[in-house]
Each structure stands twice: as structure tokens, then as C-alpha cells.
Amino acid sequence: MRKGVDKRAMAALSAGHLFTDVNQGAVAALVPFLVAERGLSLAAAGSLVLAATLSSSIVQPLFGHFSDRRPLPMLMPLGVALGGLGIALVGVASSYPLILLCVVLSGLGVAAFHPESARFANYVSGSRRARGMSFFSVGGNAGFALGPVITTPLVLSFGLPGTLFLVLPASFMGLALLHELPRLLTFQPKAEEAAVGRKGAKAPEHWGPFARMIGAVTVRSFVYFGLVTFVSSYYIQVLGSSTLLANSALSVMLFAGGVGTLVGGPLADRIGRRAVLAVSMLLLSPLIYAFTVSGPLLGMILLALIGAATIGTFGVTVVMGQEYLPGRIGVAAGVTMGLSIGLGGIGAPIFGALADNQGLPTTMLAISALPLIGLLLALSLPRSPARSSD
């Protein structure tokens, strides 16, 4: 096994992750424009985020299951291209059902990309999987953060049809990944090693701790998507800020999450994955509450800390899942990166309905209470997979 991360291979995978998740970030950035120009309610807007989340996540374990049995590397270039095509068509869709369909199409492309790319991220990381997965994850974090940065100027300049430009970077990245595939394939385990891994004979699988960890990830996802969906609207409706400043605040949170990811991976290697996850949950409740009583500028500082605490553990939990299920790393990645996040995305329309009826300040307070549940679940996990028991 390699001692370190292969830089060229990881750069290709992380860049693919970035260009794929730009499309997911674009959905959240389009919410204020769709509300203003298409007359969508906050609940309907939240449902778009839910559709993007579910379509990009629920089927990920299925892709992971098939890739555990037979690798499907072509899903990486095809996934990023399809993700860009779907979101590009959102701005020219003439009705809410068509908008929803385009969002789902984009989400399916995202779903196809993630399990297979996470598998190869595991392969090219050698013995430093937490560090390698943090590099892979930060690509997705950066992509989600760039979604609003890229989308907002396009829509401000060209109207909603400006989303058509988003197909260009996705197509470019799809071709780049297609070019890199032959080299990436050299990192796959030998056939006999892969067969042993699929049977799970090398190490036991710990479904009990895995399920509890997924519970914590789901809670984190409720918090994450609640904030991603309504931070911009909170700035506009509660703090009286412009759309540009509102989406900038969202980008600050997401970019800080990328920094948190780079810190969280190496830190988890030193003090333990469980400790990093638990501390992040412990910090989130007071930080989100402080945000609700702050102005726009202090709010941005707090959002940076919130983003680091929320997003910084994404890579850590992917590695935890793969360690709990060492013979099913595709399924583990699909559930950790997909299904659990999709379940958390159910919170978007729930929080949207709460915001429509009780207001955004009350909604933010509700979001601030959730990390306490995640903290309890994180503390119930074993300190290492070797100590796990079902």
C-alpha cells in the first residue's frame, strides 16, 4: 500500500468533485431568484432543495452496491456532465414541474459521480485515508461554495437563462476525467484482493456503530441544509441585506467549511474521528444561536465558524463509514455521502413550512437545537473501529 496520497490522481478526483458539487450549490443560490421571479413560496423553494438532495443521494448506495461488485469508473465523467446539464436547464424551464425535473436530472448525475469517485479517493490515498479523503471532500465543499459565486453574477447579468452557461465547466471536467481514467484504473486493487474485500473476509463489519454514526450524519445534514436553504433568505428578509450580500454570506459559510475539512482530516488522524465529530456537534448549537442575535457582519464571522464545524467533518465521517464496513466501501460511501445527507435534506421543506408560518428567526432557533442530538449519537460511538461491537 502507498504511504501517501498520489497528488495527480487526487487532484483529478477533487476537481471532479468540485465541478460536480457546483451544481448542488447553484440550487441554493437560485432559490431567492426563483422566489422573486417565479413566485415560489419558501416551502416550494425548500422542496427544490429537497428534490436536489434526494435525487443526488437516495440512489447513491445503489450505485455504491454495484461498484462494490463491479467497478463503474465511467460514472465519474458521465455524472459530472449530467449534473451540469440538468442545472443549466433550470433557468429556462417554464414551469415549476419542469424546474423540478431539471433539478432531479442534475441530482442523478451527482449521485452517479460520488460513490465511484469516493472509492478511487480511497485507493489513491494509500495509508493516509483521512488526509486523502479530506482533500477529496474539500473539492466538493469548494464546489458547493462556488455554486452561489458563479450562479449569482450569471443570473444578475443574463436573468435566469444565465444558468445555461453552467453546462460549460461540467462538460470540460467530464472530458478531463475521461482523459485521466486510464491512470486512475492503475490504482485499483488486484482482482484477488478486490474479491477478498467484497466478501468482507479481511476485517469484520460493524453495522451497529455504522448506524449510529449515520444518525449523527443525518442530524448534521438537517442542520446543514436548513442553513444552506435559508441563510440567504434570512439575510434578505430579517437583516434587510441585498441579494448579493445574502449569497456572499452563504459562500462565506461554505468556503469556511472547506477550510474546516482540510483541518478536520489531519486532526482526526491525531485525536480520533469520534472526538472531532463530537466536538463539532458541541460547538454548533451555541454558534447558531449567536448568529440569530447578530447583525450582518458579525453574522458572517459566525457563519464561517458554523461552516467549519458543520462541513469540516464530512470527510471524517466518510472514512469512519468505510472503516466500519471495510468490505463495502462503495456502499459505505454511498450511505455516508448520499443517503444520510438525503434524509437530512427532508428538513428543508419542514423548515420552509415552519418559516412560512412562524418566521425565519424561529426556524433558525429550531435548527440550533438539533446538534445536541448529534452530540449524543457521536458520544455513543467507539473510539476506534477495532473496539466496535454490534
Q: Where do the model's predicted regions map?
A:
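Extracytoplasmic gate region of multi-pass secondary transporters
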Residues: 27-28, 208-258
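Conserved MFS/SLC helix-loop-helix module at the cytosolic interface between two early adjacent transmembrane helices
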Residues: 58-96
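Cytoplasmic helix-loop-helix junction between adjacent transmembrane helices
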Residues: 103-139
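Helix-loop-helix hairpin linking two adjacent transmembrane segments in secondary transporters
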Residues: 136-183
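C-terminal membrane-cytosol helix-exit motif in multi-pass small-molecule transporters
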Residues: 168-194, 377-382
